[in-house]
Amino acid sequence: MNRLTPTRSISNPTLGDVTRAMVEFAHKGKQDLEVRRLCEIICEDLAQGDYAGECLAIYYWVCQNIRYMRDIHDVEFVKEPARVLETRSGDCDDMATLLAAMLMAMGNRCDFVLASFNGAAVPSHVYVRVYSPKGPIVLDPVANRDTGKMLGELTSASTVPV
C-alpha cells in the first residue's frame, strides 16, 4: 500500500453514488490478501468455529486502530479498505467499508445500515450489520467512540446488502 492507494472523491454525491462505491470497495477489499492476513492475525487466538467471536474481534480491532476523521467540508471521499489501513483513519463510510471487507474476507455476509438522526430525512451515518451463525450483530465503530451524543436520536435506518 502507498499514497496512491485509491480513494474516490465524489462531488455533489447522491446517496446511491456513495453506497455503490462502498459496496464496490468492500468486495474488492474482501479479496485483498493483506486484509485477509490481518483478519487471520486478529483471530488467531480464538477457538476454531467461534465465528461470532471473530466478528467481534475484527470489530474491536477497527475501533481501536482506525481513527475517526471527517471528510473535507462539502466533499465526499470514499476510501478503499487498503487506503483506510494505510492511513489508519476514515469517516463512518470508510470504517464501515473496511469492517465489511474484513468480515466478508472471513466468510460472513454483511449489510450497510444507513441511518438518519434527529428527524433528518437523508441518512448521515452508516454502520455494519453482520450475519453470524448466532444471528445478526450490529457493529458501529463510530458509536463505539462515545459519539452517541453526536449522532442524536435515530430517526430511520435502511439497509444496503453488501
Predicted ranges, named:
Residues 1-162:
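A structural boundary/capping signal
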